[in-house]
Amino acid sequence: RMNIIINQLQKNFGPKVAVDIENYSIQSGDMLGLVGNNGAGKTTLFRLMLDLLKADGGSVHIGNIDVSRSEEWKNITGAFIDEGFLIDYLTPEEYFYFVGKMYGLTKEEVDKRVARFERFMNGEVIGQKKLIRNYSAGNKQKIGIISAMLHQPQVLVLDEPFNFLAVSYTHLTLPTIC
């Protein structure tokens, strides 16, 4: 079971408390959505969960792995926080192959897995012969979500997955990530 356990997690930026979570657990199979104002600490929490930011105190465990003390959790976790995760001088195909290679996938396996997202991409991502930097924000969002799911992770962390997506795609996003 791939539970996420948060214990005594704290992060401050100067006098501002960004995250202060005593104890929280997300059970395997659960889906959690965070809602809050801008600056409430949602993205900070995700960055702490992914060890992209050092906590002032406490810990995050994915499975039995403390994310700040081991890299093992990375093989079972997929994430897309923002377009900073993308390598924008690659085409989507090159980027998917790059991500796939990190997880030991062949080009054929990547192609097969990307094909499952065909409806979600709506003919706007693959085969366009352009760099990621030249895509719309919505299509960059799709590329990020697909890349996070490419290796079929047990844990998926997406920050604002509906951001930049046209309303007509939001109904496709949830089934894509579930």
Where would I find each of the regions flagged by the language model?
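A short, flexible loop at the N-terminus of ABC-type nucleotide-binding domains that lies
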Residues: M2-S28, D56
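The feature captures the beta-strand-to-loop junction immediately N-terminal to the Walker
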Residues: V35-N37
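Helix-to-loop junction immediately C-terminal to a conserved catalytic motif
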Residues: L50
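Conserved ABC ATPase "signature" region
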Residues: Y97, K101, E109-G127
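A short, proline-enriched helix->beta-strand linker immediately N-terminal to the Walker B motif
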Residues: L150-Q154
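Conserved small/polar residues in nucleotide/adenosyl-binding loops
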Residues: T170-T176
